[in-house]
């Protein structure tokens, strides 16, 4: 297990003290003044990669800030821990596991050693099985129980087994199959699966069930509902093998369900759920895009992996993104982070990154199990930017909390409609400028005077129209949302998460907060049956809520 017990807390590092003092000095500065003082600011605080331009110049930082943040990364041994992760060491200490989702997209020919075994043959074997199945389904050669080809794929999973494939297939829909429709079910509510199944033909549907243990409550509840719906039409348990495949490690339960051995895809415990779309969990991606599209996604991520490993810290996009985030969170005290894609293709990206960031770094103790005295992950939230402008941007511009934002846009749209993309991107560029510059009272007075508003009326409303600005943002400009670029974008954020977890000295690759809720839900579910005894062990609120629910549903 990688040694995480003897470490220096971030607050005890010299650079932390330097940054704390420096933040107090900079809090009286305005970002627009920093631009006025330095014509080369953009080039100093941006990184151009083949697939992503990362501009962080609209943050309240100077060259002194950058130097101190880089010192923090050095003193935190980010480079050493990066090497440990890529070498397959057990940096997931609470579960005693390697963290090797990066191995799934490694396009070199080098051995991938994990726990003394070269994982490359197993990875390549699963990729080959994904290729064969996806090509067979997409070509129409995969036949259902009545001899018809597949027209619809229903992916059943939750968390990382759902969010990743859903986000990617939505983002790359323009490149996907027009004859194979993709559907996703995650919610145990029942409404979602009922909506998905309505109108589908049992003779032409393929279900992909993704559950590492094949016991995940939400996933298996939906899987059993799908099975019942299918069997009502097929009336032959043997037909399940032609309409269900699984991604799981529990072969015994999967085969008992009726899924053929050759249609069970493997997972590994060194791949966390929220980082698993690169594995067979990404089978829906291969089915939608075709296997070559899935390989392009892996290629884009691999290119970012190489950049993360090889680029100097000061020109390393994941490192600088992580450091700017820590500066905003821990030294300027900003409580949240907005993700604002200005590309409809990326409309599921904020939800995907919510899980990736908050499930990874939403922790309250350090490696030694001690409560931390500093903030960990901020609240991550967002929406497609142009919709957000007419919803919550009012708060971003004039609210009492300053919320840093990542603006993500593309130079070329995946679907071109005359005039639309330039109109979209005009808003994209304008919003980051407006958040940074703001508008002061004198400017407001001049504008209102020019419109003929009376002096008395101006004084009544001037303060309501003032925007203080000084609201930080990052801009990520992509050439186009395609598979390689999306792979690079996802990997950029993955490595940002890793770097921040190392600096915060928290375990980024477990999720015990998720596990607690599962345990309690399993205990409560039997109590909801009519006639079941009440459990006096619950707190008064939970006990009475359960009683009210049971009484009302009789």
What are these regions (language model features)?
Residues 168-173, 198-202, 223-225, 261-262, ...:
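Short, solvent-exposed amphipathic alpha-helical segments in soluble enzyme
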């Amino acid at each position: 297990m990688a040694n995480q017990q003897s470490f220096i807390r971030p607050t005890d590092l010299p650079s932390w003290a330097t940054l704390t003092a420096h933040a107090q000095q900079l809090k009286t500065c305005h970002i627009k003044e920093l631009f006025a003082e330095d014509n080369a600011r953009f080039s100093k605080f941006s990184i151009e990669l083949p697939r992503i331009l990362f501009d962080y110049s609209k943050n309240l930082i100077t060259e002194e800030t950058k130097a101190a943040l880089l010192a923090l990364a050095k003193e935190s041994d980010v480079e050493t821990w990066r090497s440990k992760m890529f070498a397959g060491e057990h940096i997931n200490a609470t579960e005693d596991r390697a963290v090797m989702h990066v191995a799934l997209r490694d396009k070199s020919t080098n051995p991938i050693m994990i726990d003394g075994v070269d994982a490359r043959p197993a990875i390549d074997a699963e990729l080959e099985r994904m290729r064969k199945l996806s090509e067979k389904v997409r070509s129409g050669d995969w036949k259902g129980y009545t001899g018809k080809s597949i027209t619809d794929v229903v992916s059943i999973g939750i968390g990382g087994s759902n969010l990743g494939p859903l986000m990617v297939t939505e983002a790359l829909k323009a490149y996907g199959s027009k004859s194979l429709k993709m559907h996703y079910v995650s919610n145990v509510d029942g409404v979602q699966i009922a909506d998905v199944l309505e109108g589908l033909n049992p003779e032409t549907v393929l279900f992909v069930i993704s559950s590492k243990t094949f016991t995940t409550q939400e996933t298996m509840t939906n899987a059993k509902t799908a099975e019942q719906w299918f069997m009502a039409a097929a009336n032959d348990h043997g037909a399940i093998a032609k309409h269900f495949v699984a991604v799981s490690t529990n072969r015994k339960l999967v085969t008992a369900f009726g899924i053929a051995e050759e249609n069970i895809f493997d997972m590994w415990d060194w791949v966390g759920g929220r980082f698993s779309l690169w594995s067979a969990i990404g089978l829906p991606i291969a089915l939608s895009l075709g296997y070559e599209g899935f390989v392009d996604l892996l290629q884009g991520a691999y290119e970012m992996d190489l950049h993360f490993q090889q680029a100097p810290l000061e020109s390393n996009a994941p490192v600088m993104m992580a450091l700017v985030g820590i500066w905003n969170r821990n030294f300027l005290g900003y409580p949240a982070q907005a993700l604002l894609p200005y590309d409809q293709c990326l409309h599921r990206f904020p939800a995907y990154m919510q899980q990736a960031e908050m499930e990874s770094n939403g922790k309250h103790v350090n490696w030694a199990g001690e409560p931390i005295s500093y903030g960990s992950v901020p609240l991550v939230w967002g929406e497609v930017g142009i919709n957000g402008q007419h919803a919550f941007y009012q708060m971003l511009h004039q609210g009492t909390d300053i919320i840093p934002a990542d603006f993500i846009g593309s130079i070329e749209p995946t679907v071109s409609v005359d005039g639309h993309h330039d109109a979209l991107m005009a808003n994209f560029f304008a919003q980051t400028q407006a958040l940074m510059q703001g508008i002061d009272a004198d400017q407001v007075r001049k504008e209102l005077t020019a419109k003929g508003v009376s002096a008395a009326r101006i004084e009544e409303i001037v303060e309501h129209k003032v925007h203080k600005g000084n609201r930080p943002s990052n801009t990520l400009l992509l050439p186009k949302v395609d598979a390689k670029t999306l792979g690079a974008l996802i990997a950029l954020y993955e490595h940002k998460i890793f770097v921040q977890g190392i600096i915060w000295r928290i375990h980024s690759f477990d999720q015990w907060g998720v596990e607690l809720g599962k345990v309690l839900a399993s205990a409560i579910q039997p109590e909801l049956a009519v006639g079941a005894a009440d459990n006096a062990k619950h707190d008064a609120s939970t006990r009475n809520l359960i009683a009210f629910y049971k009484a009302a549903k009789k």
